[in-house]
């Protein structure tokens, strides 16, 4: 989970004050001392921590909080609001050119994930916003950079504009934008060159590309796990180019959160997107308020619902609901439902979006074995149509055949059939409970 270490510390700290009917200045002072230590250990910029603690302390000991009926809850609300403000307040959306194409310039150091992020962004613009993006290979220095972008283009079935590595990035950008205008592309995403460190040559070239491309957005791609190094890189790029946004990669593996909590305050540049995995759909808009809620253990129901709406086919969900009511739910239906849930993302991450997940020890430490889910899929796919519709006919010899065909063991086949039988019994109970009610039970997110 992103920011797991910081979240644990902050949740432990605020739990001490949550249920208090009366909160003194000393209580606030002690809480903020622990908050300060937690933020510093998370590699948050020292000045940012100092300002944050000051703002929360001043608001937390104010009359509105101290005289409220639930002062403990009010203090936590103040912490959440200031944490949200620290990360940018509201979601910052992509600017759109008055006349297409909208040009987005991707910049950053080598190794931050700039090329992959360019592909992810193009994929997001096409899938979620129904736009037509063009990827442009403007990194002519890194070996295989052009090849990498072309490979991503093939995976996404998306055009990649390239003039090879013997043409200047300025000329590449110029010709790419002309082609995008001719062929009516909505977005041009320039994957520019990076370096192992910031130098004048790199900045001069990027400045020249900026002048010719006139981009609506200049996104800096940084590795969130590098903490204050990411903040320093953002500061340097912002001074030279005037960044419009930051994309934090590897946020799913960042247990501390120093970069995310410092970048906006230090550079006044919003975090636009967060990379949450290696898959090409693992890029999400950065929502400061939702992230603050997750850090404080309040869950992120809105993101969970959005993921469900994007992954679950509404017509199929209604059909599935009807099958559950009539007890005609088969192993094929179960397999389809499992696939839709897996499309929403790693199951352990989805569980962490539930409010109060941090306080439930069993849920917090749960490790979902994706390999086990692969085994379940393989077992069901190794069954005949009749076996999937009537699992009761699966005798010992059939179980051996299914295990052999799926590369699993008979014990795993037995376990799946037992779990499916128990699930059907539970559905029957739910159906009986809903009798007499007009609507009956509904699937989640319906």
Swiss-Prot record:
CDD domains: SRP_G (cd18539). Keywords: Cytoplasm, GTP-binding, Hydrolase, Nucleotide-binding, Ribonucleoprotein, RNA-binding, Signal recognition particle. InterPro entries: AAA+_ATPase, P-loop_NTPase, Signal_recog_part_SRP54_M_sf, Signal_recog_particl_SRP54_hlx, Signal_recog_particle_SRP54_M, SRP, SRP54, SRP54_GTPase_dom. It is an enzyme of class 3 (hydrolase). GO terms for cellular component: signal recognition particle. Its EC number is 3.6.5.4. The keyword GTP-binding applies. One of its GO terms (biological process) is SRP-dependent cotranslational protein targeting to membrane. It is found in: Cytoplasm. SUPFAM superfamilies: P-loop containing nucleoside triphosphate hydrolases, Signal peptide-binding domain. GO terms for molecular function: 7S RNA binding; ATP hydrolysis activity; GTP binding; GTPase activity. It catalyses: GTP + H2O = GDP + phosphate + H(+). GTP binds at residues 108-115, 191-195, 249-252. The keyword ATP-binding does not apply. Pfam families: SRP54, SRP54_N, SRP_SPB. It comes from the Bacteria. Part of the signal recognition particle protein translocation system, which is composed of SRP and FtsY. Interacts with a small cytoplasmic RNA (sc-RNA). NCBIfam families: ffh. Belongs to the GTP-binding SRP family. SRP54 subfamily. Involved in targeting and insertion of nascent membrane proteins into the cytoplasmic membrane. Binds to the hydrophobic signal sequence of the ribosome-nascent chain (RNC) as it emerges from the ribosomes. The SRP-RNC complex is then targeted to the cytoplasmic membrane where it interacts with the SRP receptor FtsY. Interaction with FtsY leads to the transfer of the RNC complex to the Sec translocase for insertion into the membrane, the hydrolysis of GTP by both Ffh and FtsY, and the dissociation of the SRP-FtsY complex into the individual components. Composed of three domains: the N-terminal N domain, which is responsible for interactions with the ribosome, the central G domain, which binds GTP, and the C-terminal M domain, which binds the RNA and the signal sequence of the RNC. This is Signal recognition particle protein.
